Amino acid sequence: VLAFLKVDFSVYAFNTVDRQVVCWLVKPSEMKWNNSAAKRLAQISANGGTPLAEVYDRMLHVLTSKKPDIFLTLSDGEPADANAVKLILKSYRSLGIKMTAIGVGRDTFSATSIANNLKYLGYDKVLAVSRLPDIPNRVLSILSDN
């Protein structure tokens, strides 16, 4: 959807391996979204327990140089350290980055619960999704509000 709209975007993914945060650049901004990027993204398993504040801290240097308008996080759970996430969200906002999130759950109740937790952390905009095919429309709604 974003590629069709000619929106300049990058895709990063992260999880934990042996209690260490691992971040991947799935699609750099100068590359078009393609099957290769989709396959790279699909190979990354969601295994929970990701320290979101640590991930955001690692990405801060990238965001400082790229200065995106919006940073969109898809989350399927709660961060390990809510207070640390709140602090780093403030840092990102001070750079002029609109912090948004989509809570992804297995059903409407869990998606809404995840989204409510994300809203409590201080994201500028939060949405809930329980059906993966709904994600493109949710992303569009975030972009249209910007």
Regions found by a protein language model. Name each.
Residues 1-146:
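Acidic, glycine-rich A-domain
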